[in-house]
UniProtKB/Swiss-Prot annotation:
Gene3D superfamilies linked to this entry: P-loop containing nucleotide triphosphate hydrolases (3.40.50.300)
Localisation per UniProt entry: Cytoplasm
Pathway in which the depicted protein is active: Cofactor biosynthesis; coenzyme A biosynthesis; CoA from (R)-pantothenate: step 5/5
Source organism per UniProt: Albidiferax ferrireducens (strain ATCC BAA-621 / DSM 15236 / T118) (Rhodoferax ferrireducens)
CDD domains assigned: DPCK
Domain of life from the UniProt record: Bacteria
Chain's role: Catalyzes the phosphorylation of the 3'-hydroxyl group of dephosphocoenzyme A to form coenzyme A.
Enzyme Commission code: 2.7.1.24
Single annotated GO MF: ATP binding
Protein name: Dephospho-CoA kinase
Keyword terms of this UniProt record: ATP-binding, Coenzyme A biosynthesis, Cytoplasm, Kinase, Nucleotide-binding, Transferase
GO BP annotation list: coenzyme A biosynthetic process
Length: 212
């Protein structure tokens, strides 16, 4: 396959999607990480902070000038209209930065761009922009145990997050390829990623030291 390849990458929380993105980056892909962009937007004095404060009030901004993630998470999962108001602030800014990073990666000559998007399947606009969709999958039990250990959330909190995302079946139905990452070692996962890259004909090559 010649030319720039646009690969959508998604998976439920705790699936290992970000690890897969990192492995693809090591092969030379440019990664556009929607979560990382959103975190930047809501970091201290980030581009979204003023609108969040105006919409939700100063109680949702920490003393450092960042969005209070814990408080906002609780509100968003309890009140769908609040979540929609937050998304109306965040999503246009994420799209703008995504477009900037995509253009930059293309101009730099990357063979493929990986769009790491947690809510890719839920979106009505992403699929038409992509050549392929790769889903990183694992069982719900594995999701829960990983996220509880990583984020210090309760089981109930993790289950609410999982319930707010696309169903496992929905994600799998949208996939052009699937990596089942339930109990893979990092080495085994890397081999799976290499196989997927070959399957799609991605011309990714490991980065040389001066490119990293």
């Amino acid at each position: 396959m010649r030319g720039l390849v646009r690969l959508g990458l998604t998976g439920g929380i705790g699936s290992g999607k970000s690890t897969v993105a990192g492995l693809l980056a090591e092969l030379g892909a440019a990664v556009v990480d929607a979560d990382a962009i959103a975190r930047h937007l809501t970091a201290p004095n980030g581009p979204a902070i003023a609108s969040i404060a105006a919409t939700f009030g100063p109680d949702f901004i920490t003393s450092t000038g960042a969005m209070d993630r814990e408080k906002m998470r609780a509100l968003a999962y309890a009140d769908i209209t609040a979540r929609q108001r937050l998304e109306a602030i965040i999503h246009p800014l994420v799209r703008q930065e995504t477009q900037r990073q995509t253009l930059l990666a293309a101009n730099q000559g990357h063979p493929c761009i990986v769009f790491d998007v947690p809510l890719l399947v839920e979106s009505t606009t992403w699929r038409e922009k992509l050549d392929w969709v790769l889903v990183v999958d694992c069982t719900p039990a594995t999701q829960i145990s990983r996220v509880m250990a990583r984020n210090a959330l309760t089981r109930d909190e993790v289950e609410k997050i999982i319930a707010s995302q696309a169903s496992r079946r929905h994600r799998l139905n949208a996939a052009d390829a699937v990596i089942f990452n339930d109990s893979l070692s990092l080495g085994a996962l890397a081999l799976e990623v290499d196989e997927v890259a070959r399957h799609f004909g991605l011309s990714c090559q490991p980065l040389s030291p001066n490119q990293k």
